[in-house]
Amino acid sequence: MRSSLELLIRRVVPAVMMMGISGTVTAKDHLLTIGGGYSPTGNQASLEANVIFYQQLVSQSYSTPVEHLIYFADGTDPKDDLQVMAAESNTESPAIELLEGIFSADGPQVTYRNHEIPNITDKIRPAAIQTGLEQIASHVVGGDRLIIYVTAHGGSAKGDDPMDTSITCWGKQPISMRQFTEWLDEIPSDVSVVMVMAQCYCGGFANTMFSGGDPKNGMSKGNRVGFFAQRHDLPAAGCRPDITNDDEYSSYFWGAFLGQSRTGKPVGIVDNDQNNRVSFSEAHAYAVVASPTVDIPLRTSDVYLRAHSRIAGHREGAAASPSAENSGKDVELGLSSLSGSLSNLAVQASLDQRVMINGLLTQLKLPFDIEVAEILNQKEIQEERFRQARREAGRRGSSRRESRSSGRRDLQQQIIQNWPELQEADDWDDLESLTGRRGEGFLDELRDLPAFETYWTSKVERSRAQEKSVYAELKAVQFRRLVHTIESVVFAKNLPVIASPEILKRYTEMLTLESSFFGS
């Protein structure tokens, strides 16, 4: 059984999409991409790879050329601005490989080059991006869409508004959510805006749905929705010099349309309603389930629900309070709570929400008929496991005290004392003592050094503690995603009970836009 709201959306979306092929009005998409870092050291190769991957999707999704303004890092400046992984050592000597691990600095070894993104509009700077939005606003027509993709760095809120997070531009110039919203307010109200954002703290930009980015001003005149990698109060995953790792939200989101991730990992079933097209909301559902990151992705409609609906006995939501008075009102109104069997609650969920719930339950090895209260209980247990694992990893981490007790520095000194010729790493490949059978003998002698056992034991223990912490965090994140989805189901179920017709109408319009398709 589908909710009445979902059935309405399923009827409205095809009608809206047909407007572009009816022969009277052909709506166009206009794309604006903001990518890259704030300096060469903050401009990781994964950001470049994300933009190139998106360009590939655009070229395959539109039958005719589409306007696409791209702002990336330092723009067309030929200087090296991109941080990439240094070439790995190709040594075949186990002795040299071990020495490299002992003497090299922790973390990836990097180098720099100029970015290779074609068709750049300008560098990532506030004035240029504002000009680009003004340019688009000057020639769009009613029914067009503006699609904005951000794969950059972001900053947390600095003032009193926790949602006023920012995009960090070249030279560390910020674009705050409220400033960005003021620019969007200049877009004609009959032009819809779809945002896909993957920067840290990007969830704050969900408030672009309000005029000026401020809930006190009411909703914006135009319909705006967004899909965000992370909440407004947490950093996001994904910025790294290693492009072989594409575990970040937008790679999975855009990969849902192409059938593979940025690195070629195949995508499973995404077309949940089997209409032979992938919608934005279906891509989001896939990313929520498939991306193994610390992110808790959300969309604008999730934030809208929390602004206008509430859950019985729940602190979050419109006019929410744990007071006995409000609890009594909630019961009187018949508002649903976070209780009962999940299988019964899921009947009220949209198709995409059910996909997320089923996928996350499978990952957590939980039954579909589990009680919601038990999910909340297990979530708290996993959160505590993560806190303990993180504390343990911190104790064995990179603090000065731990560095002194790891034995690494002592081992380095003992190696140089016994083999002074090893002081220059560039000479290692030329030393016969490190290759062949002589290399095997060197390894035996190195392992007999007094500091080696301390170094190796500490290295193994740190690695195990870190792996345990990462595993515990990912499990906690899966619970957070599941609970977030369940809450959204209940918020949506309660919305018609307490909201005005205008609020319901706007929510329906949001869902319609979120369920639209990418491309022509």
Label every model-predicted segment:
Residues G37-T41, D74-K79, A152-K158, K172-P174, ...:
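Solvent-exposed loop/turn segments at secondary-structure junctions
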Residues I52, V194-V303:
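Active-site-proximal C-terminal subdomain of hydrolase catalytic domains
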